[in-house]
Design a protein with these regions (language model features):
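C-terminal catalytic subdomain
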Residues: 50-77, 81-159
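"…together with the soluble PPM/PP2C metallo-phosphatase catalytic core" -> "…together
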Residues: 2, 8-69, 118-125
Length: 159
């Protein structure tokens, strides 16, 4: 992962793994300069030292391998989607209902909580299932992109 987007792994209703933010407040917290209760309101809470699209190459951090079990929930979200909630609230919402129901509800709550200062909201979640291999037809997959923005293709140089 990179920056302050987070990956959560949830097993049996409990947080199994959470990635470490690449932010100034995370470093300050690890160094004992601030308390955990200060993180959400600290003036530097949105300053990241590694990100995609910045002037410098990102510091990509690979988490330790964690074997998944049937029923585990994996969620990847931007800071706009996780910041309005405590980790316990986010974990509870994703652990007690299907991701298909939890994700839209969490995004709506995050948007309302942020108000006119709403950051980008991205939250993707899935529940792991054992032994089910699914083949998806490319045409079928592409037909389900009505709310997805396709990447802009670079122009080809005609020289």
């Amino acid at each position: 992962h990179v920056g302050d987007s987070r990956l959560y792994a949830i097993r049996a209703g409990r947080l199994l793994v959470q990635t470490r933010d690449h932010s100034q407040v995370q470093l300050m917290l690890e160094q004992g300069l601030i308390e955990p209760d200060d993180v959400a309101t600290h003036p530097a809470r949105n300053r990241v030292y590694s990100c995609l699209g910045g002037n410098l190459l990102p510091e990509i951090e690979f988490s330790r391998k964690t074997p998944l079990k049937a029923g585990d929930v994996i969620a990847l979200c931007s800071d706009g989607a996780w910041a309005p909630f405590t980790d316990d609230t986010l974990v509870h919402a994703l652990a007690t209902t299907s991701p298909a129901h939890a994700v839209p509800k969490l995004l709506n709550l995050a948007e309302v909580a942020a108000g006119k200062h709403c950051d980008n909201l991205t939250l993707m979640a899935m529940q792991w299932e054992e032994g089910n291999t699914v083949q998806v037809d490319k045409t079928e997959a592409m037909a389900n992109t009505e709310n997805t923005h396709m990447p802009i293709q670079p122009e080809q140089n005609s020289q």
